[in-house]
């Protein structure tokens, strides 16, 4: 899927150019999941998530494509990535973040 390839390219670039940007990536993806959950619960104003009205259509399309279960699954994967950054869990946080991107893209 082209969206997945493009997203993966961005993640690869972030890792290559600034390995410390993993925390920003995790934060952004978690924010997106929280916004998608808010949309699923009927909320239309996502400004509290830093998402403006001109971006709502994109989030609605994602929300229509993703189930609540999938969004929860992605949130859990992102939590694991965060724990790997902090050393609470062993493993590569970048690989785990890529897993979250894949789950959001399918």
What are these regions (language model features)?
Residues 57-59, 75-86:
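Short helix/strand-capping connector loops at secondary-structure junctions
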Residues 3, 71, 77, 93-96:
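Generic hydrophobic secondary-structure packing signal
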Residues 94-106:
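Acidic, carboxylate-rich catalytic segments that either coordinate divalent cations
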Residues 33, 37-40, 82-86, 105:
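A structural signal for well-ordered alpha-helices, especially hydrophobic packing surfaces
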Residues 28, 73, 77-80, 100-103:
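Charged, amphipathic alpha-helical oligomerization/scaffolding segments
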Residues 1-73:
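Small-residue-rich helix-loop
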């Amino acid at each position: 899927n082209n969206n997945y390839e493009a997203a993966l390219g961005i993640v690869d670039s972030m890792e290559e150019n600034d390995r410390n940007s993993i925390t920003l990536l995790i934060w952004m993806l978690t924010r997106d999941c929280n916004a998608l959950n808010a949309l699923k619960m009927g909320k239309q104003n996502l400004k509290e998530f830093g998402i403006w009205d001109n971006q709502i259509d994109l989030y609605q399309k994602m929300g229509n494509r993703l189930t609540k279960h999938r969004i929860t699954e992605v949130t859990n994967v992102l939590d694991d990535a965060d724990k790997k950054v902090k050393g609470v869990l062993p493993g590569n946080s970048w690989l785990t973040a890529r897993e979250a991107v894949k789950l959001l893209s399918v």
